[in-house]
Structures are given as structure tokens and as C-alpha cells.
């Protein structure tokens, strides 16, 4: 599918640049460097046009970037869903003696087809890529659930990608 092509292009372009940006369709996608300077992140990068209006319930259409720059510094909303996964995470936190309030309900929207990308900072090496597709049986889940945030993998020399769908 076209998503595979987009991911391949993103990975290729991420490996070419030593700064924290890459270009898609003449739009500069601007990421950020982590506070410990070990990783770069590009959060909430759209891979398809929003599936709303006449695009609802249709096959995704690749994103047509029209901006000169896109700031990829925050997670995009999760797709529409029930709150059961949040309750599950809170139960896990309680089970391990943690604070259940650490887990908060994600923002949700029908406009939810986004990628999050993490990579090591200061390298132009070809790197392995790990793509996470969250679970939830198409009823719950989001690409930045605590167990899907990719900064730890990136600090170990891996490009990590999560997909919202």
C-alpha cells in the first residue's frame, strides 16, 4: 500500500539529514531533540488525509502537504474509541503499586491517521526499523500508549515508528 512507500521514504530521508527535519512534498517536517540529546522525535506526522466528511469509511488517501513547514512536536489525537484501554492501564498501574492518575484519557478525533517516529540523534547510519501497530481490536488503543513510545528503542540505535489508525 502507499503507506509502505511513505514509511520507506520517511526512513530514507530521516537517515540523510543530520538536523531534525526532513521533507515530504516540499514541506519541511520539523522534529525535536530529546532533553538528554540522545534521540530525535517527529510526532503526529500525518500519513493520510483526515478520514472525515466524504472520506469517512473510505480507503485512506495519502496526505497532500501544502504547508511550507509542519511542526511535529506533539502527538496527534487517537482515533474514536471507548475508554476501556485507559481503565486497563490504570489497573496495571495499581497492580504494580503505581499511581493510576499517571494514565490519562487520550484526546480522540476522527482525524487520527498519523505516524510518530523516533531515531537516535547524531547519526547518519542505516539503522534497523521497528514499527509498532497498537492493539485494541479496532476498538481501543493509540500510538502513544506508554508501552509504544519509542524513545528508549531509539536511544539503543533503532528507528521506532508507531502508527495511529
Annotate each predicted stretch with a short phrase.
Residues 1, 18-19:
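Absolute protein N-terminus
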Residues 1-9:
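Sec-dependent signal peptide recognition
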Residues 8-17:
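Hydrophobic h-region of N-terminal signal peptides that target proteins for export
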Residues 19-165:
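Non-catalytic accessory segments of hydrolases
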